[in-house]
Amino acid sequence: GRGYSERPRTKYDKNLYLETLRELILSQKINEKVHIVGYSMGGPIASYYAAEYPNEVTSVSLIAPAGFSKSLPQTKSWITMPVVGDWFWRVFSHRLYGVGNMSETQYSDDPLSINEDKFLPLFQDQLRFKGFNESLLSTIRNFNLFDVRDMYENLSKKEIPMLALWGKKDGIVPFSGSEEYQRIFDNGKLVVLEEGTHDITYRQPTIVGTEIIDFIDQL
């Protein structure tokens, strides 16, 4: 449903993403444990996988992970409504993306940073493919992006080494969620990017990449 992957007409729920990730890993014929990394919505997906297959996972690294919120945004209640939600999404989704896809970070001195003029065309290219809006709407309706703390609690019992990287100025997945992360994963590592926003993967990639590599190397 994202990037250049297929956009089947189906329910985009936890099971779909979990099964897709499972198929991908099996297709690579990996015969050892994996270090799994999830960004934003990928945080819960990676964590669901680790909770389901703990004996196959060495570590989990979360980048600005969704699912630690204590409250549900008002917008979601509108979008989940039949007919009204469909109409709203058809009419306004492109406009929302026109604003929402702008980087929160106006400047980055990271030499590997992807600038706005390069990022936006790549991001917006997805919108021209049939099924993108539908898959995104289905995800919002069927995948819990906001509060999956029960799943995280279950994962914490597996005693898998955990890392979370979070921008303190994240306007998409609030930094306040890091408090719940630390409560649930009391032995987990938290790296805070003081000036980081939600786009730390492509605006501060050097810091993010280095922290993940160092974390894995120490295991």
Per-range role (PLM):
Residues 38-42, 46:
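Gly/Ala-rich beta-loop-alpha elbow adjacent to hydrolase catalytic centers
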Residues 1-37, 210:
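Active-site loop/oxyanion-hole signature of alpha/beta-hydrolase fold enzymes
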Residues 144, 169-173:
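Acidic catalytic loop of the alpha/beta-hydrolase fold
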Residues 71-73, 77, 91-157:
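Conserved alpha/beta-hydrolase catalytic His-Asp/Glu region
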Residues 150-152, 174-183:
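Short alpha-helix in the alpha/beta-hydrolase fold that links the catalytic acid
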Residues 158, 164-166, 170:
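Short beta-strand/loop motif that positions the catalytic acidic residue
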